[in-house]
């Protein structure tokens, strides 16, 4: 197998394209690096570059930007600003509890607050009052009661990582889960686990938190240093395979309260539940991801660590409400710098923070049309039907397994703009959370959300409840077998109601098919037709056949493609996403039939991944991100698609050519 040198549009001193190398002169005192312009790229050598060359050569990064492309070019901020301007300037009386009424009142409250010095000072004093309570704590019991108060009254998660969430073993129910912490006091646990000397750079904010509370610098420094040693202990006990896993929930197990109590040496199950504001647990235990980390955190609860734990609680509280103290505590300004955005955009950001689903509803009403809904619904069903054909024809799997996979396919539910419009209703009770100023409103919203989560305990879970905001450019597959496609991603080049069907199929259709493909990727394949984690739901023989394909796919993506002629993708890390891309392309090409349809589809598929990004970003992505770089998502997928060879007449020797015996498939 020869190595395919993918052309990558990154900001580097030299650009290397398949079949064409740019010789860069060595830098001397009189010469500087230069890149001759590239006028054209052959589709057969680098399809990503062939489609996107002109766009990328005309793209520049603004100051501070690290990338720009199709995803970032959808200007939802301006769309929301336009909608808000219409609402605020309107003389219409909106229904009580409507998204228009709530958004308008929150917007105006934010503007009023920013112009009211007395309100800003009052908010600062309210935060200081809570810090004084933390400062005056004299025992662990008092501190644990303080943690419960902050969780219940401010929505502040501290000392206890318990949360009411989906039961991963039964998505129609809630469960109480101990979530693995990836950081404490802003300290990335994996980073200090590997390099403890890096911990020192994170001590300053802890020191400044304590100085706000009245500690001298010397006293604050001592407490911060001791707290950092405690955090390192937690890092050493943390299983980072979980945090880095494509499917972290596969590490989850249910432990009874008695089993958890037996594992804890300092606190009890009830102690941790009370700190999370949970007074009743009908489940008789918790879902636990990382037992080792839990026991390490439990070991911190010793009276000798009281000052350090107080610092941790104060840090967590100010991480959520610290912006309100900067007017009187300048040392905290660096953590909440003055926004350079317009006051209008700041107000929209505030609404997104406290009323995200209100903003979501507002966006859907303004930008999702009946025509879009009809076209999108048709596309989703075409994609489902295409997957049905692919799975049915996968005779390398047993008939029994294919029936089960088809059942899972049929059970997939789409959460989109049309679904939101069906579920949308006015909620007058939202007016009850408005306080005298934005601080009080933020606190009241947090209190309401916590109370709602507690009410969910013991109740059935609606897996179709909206979890993603429609004003964010996003798409996702949920472990409970739902696919969410936001309205914000339904802009060009992904989707255009006035474009032809196959252009849209290569854009948004590829995204939808990608998310559906996740239902059958290397990790989600362990979840059954009802979205329940059950690695044994398929026969051992068929699971082995699927896993053998995993090994082939890992080899294909690691050994066939390079970035910068040097770096390779991590085939294991990216396997789930690569499989979703692979299944997506097989699905949408299965819908097309003519050369023109394929061309429209292929070109827009390349177009949606168009991005200009810093080379350092891409190098980091290769080691940290489960997604492959954009060029590989295009070229590596098309290089193993037979129809692509026919349309563009690929032959041995072309940059993207892969011999037939080395091409891979998800379903064929």
Where are these regions (language model features)?
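Short, Gly/Pro- and small/polar-rich lid/capping loops
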Residues: 29-35
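Noncatalytic, helix-rich "gating/capping" subdomain that lines the substrate-entry/channel surface
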Residues: 85-383
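C-terminal motif of bacterial Sec signal peptides marking the signal peptidase cleavage site
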Residues: 15-19
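Bacterial N-terminal signal peptides that target proteins for export
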Residues: 1-7
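Active-site-surrounding "flap" and adjacent substrate/cofactor-binding loops of secreted or lumenal enzymes
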Residues: 42-46, 50-117
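Bacterial lipoprotein signal-peptidase II cleavage site
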Residues: 21-28
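Intrinsically disordered, low-complexity linker/terminal regions across diverse proteins
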Residues: 356, 361-668
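Hydrophobic/aromatic-rich, well-ordered segments within soluble, folded domains that form packed cores
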Residues: 39-57, 192-210, 585
